Design a protein with these regions (language model features):
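Catalytic core of membrane glycerolipid acyltransferases/transacylases, capturing the structured
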Residues: 46-60, 76-77, 93-145
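Hydrophobic/aromatic ligand-binding patch that stacks against planar heteroaromatic rings
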Residues: 107-108, 131, 157, 195-197
């Protein structure tokens, strides 16, 4: 990995409070329902604290099942419905997703309990930070860009060892709404972590995360965590929202050649996530997209990375 500039892992978006829903824009649940959700969330946080202690001693299959179950249960406690479309490959892979909210972490872990790459600040988040550390999250110190090559090597080693890894290569959250071109983080998908997939010979699987309000049938930024917004304010919006749905769409895997350019690989993944052409996206000559398969019932030996069978899995809140 080449030397990096001081702003490589300090990306920023153009989002501000205007990107968040206006008062009354998103249907809400009554106050008693919000209180019940908060009680449920508190229960899941307590369970998560206990789980963080157990994770290091659990065998890998049980550890992955526990993390997946906790992530799904916590999303349900917040009143969020999770919809999963597609199926992950059976090989260990680098999972890359767009970044809108802190809920993205729960959504990804609910699909596949992978090792995450996250900013150092996540370590201080209540319970989620403890779980992240216990699950082997690779924390990125964005104030020390010269440490990035070592971080990429850690991700490469994890992939070579057969452990899937998930990363949000935009490096920051943004609204990703229609007409939000000015909000897009400068540089789009950062290419550094894609080098790990190339070096490890691992496929790259783009994940598309989208939030919508089932009541209105439209996309919403109610769950977004943007700009000067605080984690508590963002959580309060989620707890109050009526029928909030997060969908995780698993796109076709990209199989980079050994001599692939990480920048082109990043552009190709970004194009798959945002469903629009990105300047400089790689061609089939250097990347080999393989359509994802859908099965009715996987064999008993299906690796832990593979999520529940079926074209669409709807986990109702």
């Amino acid at each position: 990995v080449t030397a990096v500039s001081d702003d490589l892992w300090r990306p920023s978006s153009g989002c501000d409070e205007e990107c968040l829903p206006a008062a009354g824009e998103v249907p809400t649940v009554p106050v008693p329902r919000r209180v019940l959700r908060l009680v449920a969330v508190a229960g899941m946080l307590l369970a998560g604290a206990g789980l963080a202690v157990l994770l290091p001693v659990l065998p890998a299959p049980e550890r992955q099942a526990a993390v997946r179950g906790w992530a799904r249960g916590t999303a349900r406690a917040f009143g969020v419905r999770l919809v999963i479309r597609g199926r992950l490959p059976r090989r260990r892979a680098l999972l890359v997703a767009n970044h809108v909210s802190w809920l993205d972490i729960l959504a990804v872990l609910a699909v596949a309990p992978t090792r995450m790459v996250a900013k150092r600040e996540v370590r201080s988040w209540p319970v989620l930070g403890l779980l992240a550390a216990a699950a082997g999250t690779v924390f990125v110190d964005r104030s020390r860009p010269r440490a990035l090559p070592a971080t990429v090597r850690r991700v490469t080693d994890a992939l070579r060892a057969g452990r899937p890894v998930a990363v949000f290569p935009e490096g920051t959250t943004w609204c990703a709404g229609d007409g939000a071109a000015d909000c897009r983080p400068g540089g789009g998908f950062r290419p550094a972590m894609f080098q790990a997939a190339i070096d490890a010979g691992s496929p790259v699987v783009p994940l598309r995360l989208a939030y919508r309000c089932e009541v209105t049938g439209t996309a919403t930024t109610a769950a977004a965590f943007l700009g000067a917004d605080t984690l508590l304010r963002s959580m309060a919006r989620v707890v109050a929202a009526r029928e909030l749905v997060v969908s995780v769409t698993i796109a076709a895997a990209l199989h980079p050649a050994r001599d692939a350019d990480r920048r082109l690989l990043a552009r190709a993944a970004e194009s798959a996530v945002h469903l629009r052409p990105v300047a400089g996206a790689a061609t089939r000559g250097r990347l080999h997209p393989v359509p994802t398969l859908t099965v009715v019932a996987p064999p008993a030996s299906t690796p832990a990375l593979t999520p529940d069978a079926g074209r669409e899995l709807d986990l109702a809140a």
